[in-house]
A protein has these predicted regions:
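N-terminal pre-catalytic "stem/leader" segment of glycosyltransferase-like enzymes
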Residues: 1-66
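Conserved donor-binding/catalytic core segment of Leloir-type glycosyltransferases
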Residues: 3, 149-159
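Short hydrophobic "strand-cap" motifs at the C-terminus of beta-strands
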Residues: 6, 88, 113, 133, ...
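Active-site catalytic pocket residues across diverse enzymes, especially alpha/beta-hydrolases
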Residues: 25, 29, 125, 146
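Hydrophobic anchor at the start of a short beta-strand
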Residues: 32, 85, 128-130
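Extended catalytic core of nucleotide-activated donor transferases of GT-like folds
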Residues: 41-122
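Donor nucleotide-sugar binding/catalytic pocket of nucleotide-sugar-dependent glycosyltransferases
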Residues: 108-119, 127-144
Length: 159
């Protein structure tokens, strides 16, 4: 499968999602043409290699391939190619401005991180097929902890 991917690569929320999704697609043999939003900021060689590979593939991108854009809901106008355009906004609010609705409505489909987010898209009346695609956890960075054997809940507040 071929895919055009637009996303930032940095240490902020969208950027962390962008690099992890890029690497996951590449590991699963998707031919990803990567079009960065902003200057990629990588922190290790593995990430640099993934970005380099995506940029090299983008030189001869398939204009008919689907395009996924991981970015803000008010900036969905720009896309790569003429294939299906799938917006992947990550948001926390329960309403959208008219500008945001207009940009989201311009997408062929949407991907959102939770059932809650899909409910918001449905509630505001957007006529766009919306798919729930939860983000994952990097088990190498955050290894699973053993489950507690008692019924206590511990909260830790730092800062």
């Amino acid at each position: 499968m071929k895919l055009n991917l637009q996303a930032p690569i940095n240490q902020l929320g969208y950027g962390v999602a962008g690099i992890n999704i890029l690497k996951a697609l590449q590991v699963n043999d998707v031919e990803v043409s990567f079009f960065p939003i902003g200057q990629p900021q990588v922190t290790n060689q593995t990430d640099a290699d993934a970005v380099r590979k995506g940029l090299e593939t983008a030189q001869m991108f398939d204009p008919q391939a689907p395009c996924v854009k991981i970015w803000h809901q008010n900036q969905m106008a720009e896309r790569i190619g003429s294939g299906k355009f799938i917006g992947f906004p990550i948001f926390e609010l329960d309403t959208f401005s008219d500008l945001e609705k207009h940009h989201l409505d311009s997408c062929d489909e949407l991907m959102v991180c939770s059932k809650w987010a899909k409910g918001i898209v449905d509630k505001v009346g957007l006529d766009v097929a919306t798919h729930v695609v939860p983000l994952g956890v990097d088990a190498e960075l955050f290894p699973p902890a053993p489950a507690r054997q008692d019924d206590k809940t511990i909260f830790f507040n730092c800062g």
